[in-house]
Structure formats: structure tokens, C-alpha cells
Amino acid sequence: PESMGFPSVNVPKQKKEMSATETADFNKAQRQVLMMPAIWILALSSAFMYISRYAINSWGVFYLEAQKGYSTLDASFIISICPVCGIIGTMFSGVISDKLFGGRRNVPALIFGLMNVFALCLFLLVPGVHFWIDVLAMILFGLGIGVLICFLGGLMAVDIAPRNASGAALGVVGIASYIGAGLQDVMSGI
């Protein structure tokens, strides 16, 4: 409250006009992001992660019914584990990278990426009804996706981009992610 010496919350801040030099530096930083191979590698990685994420979300129940013989109720239950574990992975991604790996996100991103591959192999390559194996696959997949959404989908790009162009880095990765998600629908629908 203002009576305690705090500023009013309803007063709009004055927008400072950027000088020509600041504008040129800002534009240069954004172009620099587009020229960074690491940003494009992150964007491609995020696109592939979104392909696998939306493939499981879109086709997981059908796959479990058609290929493994689950009932609709059991298949839906197994697939519903994935987003719940994704929330948990997202919640703990910062703790994992900051506390366990000292702020380095590349090592946990690799670990959780490999965990996703392992989970997909369990899910797709173990034939027949093995309820607990499929549940384990969705737990691992969901946790991995939750962490990777945070790392690949944003934090790693912001970490390596110039501070005044972090929005451009997030934009490149975000666009690639949703292109991957859209392509998954087209590719798997054929």
C-alpha cells in the first residue's frame, strides 16, 4: 500500500524510447539468434520431442487397443498416466538442472531424452498385454516429456541466446515445436 511507502500499482510506467543505437543492437541480437546453429539444433530437437509427445497423445489409446489388445478403459488409463507424470517432470525440471547439475541443462536433457527413447521402445516393442510394463513406459515417457518441454522448449534457448533476444530464441524453438506437432498429425494420419 502507498501508506507504507510503496509505489502505486495502478500508475503506468513511462515507456522509454529506444535510441537508434539501441534499436540497431536489438535487431542485430535478433538476427544473431537466427544464425546460431545451437538454436536450430534445439528447435529441431524440440520438434522431434513434440512429434513423439503428440503421437502418444493422439494415437496411444488406439495403438494399445489395436496392437496389444487392451480394452478402451485400460488403454485410456495407461495413456492418462503420461500427462500426470509430465506435470511432475515439469515441476521438478528446475530442481534437477539447478541442484543436481549446477545449472547445466545439457546433461539432464540428454538423460531424459534417452529415457524417452527407452520408454518408447518399451511401449512399442514389447508385444502383448503387459500392463505394468506399459504403465512404466508411460511414467518414464511422461516424466521425460515434462522435463524436455522445459529444457528444449525454452530454458536452453534462453540460456544461450543474447539477453536482449531471448524472445527471438523462444520464438524459433516454439514455432519449430508446433510445426513438429502439426507434422505428426499429418504423418501419422497417412
State what each model feature region is.
Residues 3-42, 67:
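Juxtamembrane intracellular "pre-TM" segments in multi-pass secondary transporters
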Residues 131-155:
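Hydrophobic core of transmembrane alpha-helices in multi-pass small-molecule transporters
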